[in-house]
């Protein structure tokens, strides 16, 4: 996990030194340049002259996020304990937090000399969201399934996450193609942006910057295709209407439409077709698809937060977050509901008939006869028990003759003693 961060810091330092050398700037700006490049790489924000820029190029950030997630997945793919996960999470979140705090301190120290500022803390929280996303992706579905089994969570929740990612990846691919098509259609606006620069270095820089901002435009296109409006300061762009203002001189912005033709509303079927394709190709239960719709909406919210933000005097640039989240959920959930209903109609539940067990009815006379037979059997059993008890007593008497003789002798002795006493009493009376 330390390797991607170390490589990123090294590249940031090299890029900062190279940029200062090529622009003939003073090395006094080195610390502030390093800090701003680090925040830009982590999709945080940069500030200066009282303005905040958080609409940053997402391509370098997404590559960095992929590198961190790949390193995490390599560390946990074989075997990992809960303690190891705790240490891993602490490193994944603790290292960028420490580096971001150092970058903020460097900007604060340089603000007394240079025209730079520390970005608002709310913008810096995107750095933590960035690395949380890397941790979530790096753990992978296999580890999440193991954790679900360990803590009693339903395992189909992981299937819902996978289903949501399928939809977002397919939707993003289609949106990227639409951006390239729109750029090709508006090629005149693309080339007109570069005609104001004479030197080739500036043209190359604009093209490179457009490529770095390409994921941002792709996410904006996803929002437009789902029906959400895109705000660019006072401008509003959607498939229903377009209200434009002068945009920054960036060639990739030629992909944004300058007007909304009447047929543009038909583009709203694209996400529905994609959701249908995903649900049919990977059939899931209704509960799984509904959960996948919720996860898709939340993941798209994260993407929209990374792609948009504040852009100097334009203020907010980005999608309507509430509308985007709601529409993504509605599209996926509605398609999942329809497919589940159609599948239920095509494959109804078969109810197997249970054979009834015949019940034999007995007549009252037979019941009375059975009861009388039971009573007679009980009486016979009691008589047999009494006879057995009598026989046991007789056997005991026969087995102990000595005891009986002793008892008879003792009785005779008692009678003899009684007669002797009576004789003595009579003689005493005669003497008197």
Residue ranges and their predicted role:
Residues 165-178, 193, 197-207, 236-240, ...:
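Extracytoplasmic/cell-surface-exposed regions of Actinobacterial cell-envelope-associated
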Residues 2-66, 106-111, 199-267, 306-326, ...:
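Long, glycine/tryptophan/cysteine-rich extracytoplasmic
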Residues 87, 91-149, 184, 188, ...:
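Alpha-helical transmembrane segments of multi-pass integral membrane proteins
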Residues 1-182, 195-196, 200, 342, ...:
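N-terminal membrane-targeting/anchoring modules of bacterial envelope and secretion proteins
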Residues 251-290:
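Extended, compositionally biased non-globular segments
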């Amino acid at each position: 996990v330390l390797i991607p961060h170390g490589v990123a810091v090294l590249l940031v330092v090299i890029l900062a030194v190279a940029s200062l050398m090529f622009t003939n700037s003073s090395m006094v700006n080195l610390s502030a340049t390093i800090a701003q490049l680090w925040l830009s790489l982590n999709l945080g924000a940069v500030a200066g002259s009282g303005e905040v820029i958080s609409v940053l190029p997402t391509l370098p950030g997404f590559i960095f996020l992929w590198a961190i997630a790949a390193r995490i997945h390599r560390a946990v793919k074989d075997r990992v304990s809960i303690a190891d996960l705790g240490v891993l999470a602490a490193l994944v979140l603790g290292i960028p937090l420490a580096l971001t705090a150092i970058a903020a301190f460097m900007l604060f120290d340089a603000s007394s000399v240079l025209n730079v500022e520390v970005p608002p803390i709310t913008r810096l929280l995107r750095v933590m969201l960035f690395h949380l996303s890397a941790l979530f992706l790096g753990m992978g579905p296999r580890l999440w399934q193991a954790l679900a089994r360990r803590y009693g969570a339903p395992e189909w929740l992981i299937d819902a996450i996978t289903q949501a990612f399928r939809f977002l990846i397919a939707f993003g691919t289609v949106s990227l193609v639409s951006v390239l098509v729109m750029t090709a259609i508006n090629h005149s606006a693309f080339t007109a942006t570069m005609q104001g620069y004479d030197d080739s270095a500036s043209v190359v820089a604009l093209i490179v910057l457009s490529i770095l901002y390409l994921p941002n435009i792709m996410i904006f296109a996803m929002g437009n295709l789902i029906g959400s409006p895109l705000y660019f300061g006072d401008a509003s762009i959607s498939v229903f209407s377009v209200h434009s203002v002068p945009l920054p001189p960036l060639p990739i912005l030629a992909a944004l439409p300058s007007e909304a033709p009447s047929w543009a509303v038909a583009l709203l079927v694209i996400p529905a077709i994609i959701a249908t394709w995903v649900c049919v190709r990977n059939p899931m239960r209704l509960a799984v698809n509904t959960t996948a719709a919720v996860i898709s909406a939340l993941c798209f919210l994260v993407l929209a937060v990374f792609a948009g933000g504040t852009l100097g005097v334009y203020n907010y640039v980005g999608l309507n977050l509430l509308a985007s989240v709601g529409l993504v959920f509605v599209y996926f959930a509605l398609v999942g509901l329809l497919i589940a209903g159609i599948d239920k109609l095509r494959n109804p539940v078969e109810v197997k008939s249970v054979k009834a067990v015949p019940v034999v009815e007995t007549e009252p006379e037979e019941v009375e006869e059975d009861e009388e037979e039971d009573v007679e059997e009980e009486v016979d059993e009691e008589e047999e028990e009494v006879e057995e008890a009598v026989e046991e007593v007789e056997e005991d008497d026969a087995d102990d003759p000595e005891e009986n003789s002793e008892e008879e002798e003792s009785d005779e002795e008692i009678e003899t003693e009684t007669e002797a006493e009576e004789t003595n009493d009579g003689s005493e009376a005669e003497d008197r």
